[in-house]
C-alpha cells in the first residue's frame, strides 16, 4: 500500500502558467491528446478525477457548453459548464477517441483492454510525470486542478453558490475550503474598494 494513501494535502493549486507548461509536455499523438484532454476537464470544468473517468462521449454537449456528471459524489447527478477554450482543447482527443471502441471518454488506448476505462492511478502517474518534465515543483494532481478551477472562478467574481453547484458540493462550507488560496493582499483591496450603502438605506445616519 502506498505510504501516502489517504493522506490529505493542503490546497496549493498550480498557476495558469504551470498548468499550461504541463500541457505543453503532452506528445502530439493519441496518448498525449488524452492526457491533454484530461487536464482540460479537471481544470476548466473542475471535475473530480472519478467523475472525469466515468464520462461518456454522449455526456458532452459542446453546443450548450455542458458536461453531464451522471454519478458525482454521493451519486448526485449534475450538469456543469466549460468554457469555449476548453472545448477547443478537447477536439484532438475527441477525434482520436472516435476511432476506438465505444466506451468511456477516457480509456485504455492499446492492448487487450483497449477501449475500457482509464484508471485514476494512471491519470495521477501521467500528471506527475509531465509536471516533473515541465519543471513544476509543486504537487500536480487531479484535485489540485479542481482547486485551481474553483479559485479562478472566485477571482473572476463568480458567486459562491454557483461555484458550489459547479463543483457538486453538498454545502457551501466545503466550497469555502477550496477558496482558502485567496490571500489577505487580495481581500483587503476588494473589500476596501466597495461602494458605500445606498443613500435611502443610510438616511439619518450621522456623518
Question: For each predicted feature, which ranges?
Answer:
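Conserved catalytic core of the tyrosine transesterase superfamily
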Residues: 1-207
